[in-house]
A protein has these predicted regions:
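Flexible coil/loop and intrinsically disordered linker positions at secondary-structure junctions
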Residues: 1-137
Length: 137
């Protein structure tokens, strides 16, 4: 059985993305990169599960979504599972792997706009907050 098939089978009943990461990312991305969603729909969407309402990617937000996907995928262990999650999530968003590979770090580039730099900081802070929450006894 290939890793991709195993991932799809286990993703139906197992969360891939940590709940704290989902919720802090939700605070950054809900109604900005994606149309408005309930918290539970966003968690399901992040974990590649069915949602009650369809998820819409906002126009011109693919670049920022790519950075979010990169950042979240780096939190998923093992690394191969993170890569597979990224590919499947991008597909759900209608973003090609070639676009992702080319643009995932653009919000980090020296010439990035102020808005993109702020977005990067927001995503980085969201992941940091989730890590701190998970380390709190």
């Amino acid at each position: 059985m290939s890793d991709g098939i195993l991932f799809k089978d286990t993703s139906e009943w197992m969360d891939t993305v940590d709940l704290a990461i989902c919720m802090f990312i939700y605070d950054v991305c809900n109604d900005c990169q994606f149309g408005h969603l309930s918290g539970s729909d966003f968690v399901n969407f992040m974990n590649l599960k069915p949602t009650v309402r369809p998820v819409t990617v906002r126009p011109k937000e693919n670049l920022r979504i790519c950075y979010m996907v990169l950042s979240v995928s780096l939190t998923i262990k093992p690394r191969e599972r993170g890569k597979q999650w990224a590919e499947d999530f991008l597909q759900r968003c209608g973003i090609s792997k070639s676009y992702y590979d080319k643009h995932r770090n653009d919000v980090c580039a020296q010439g990035a706009t102020r808005e993109n730099r702020e977005y990067r900081k927001s995503i980085d802070n969201a992941i940091q907050k989730a890590r701190q929450l998970n380390c709190t006894p």
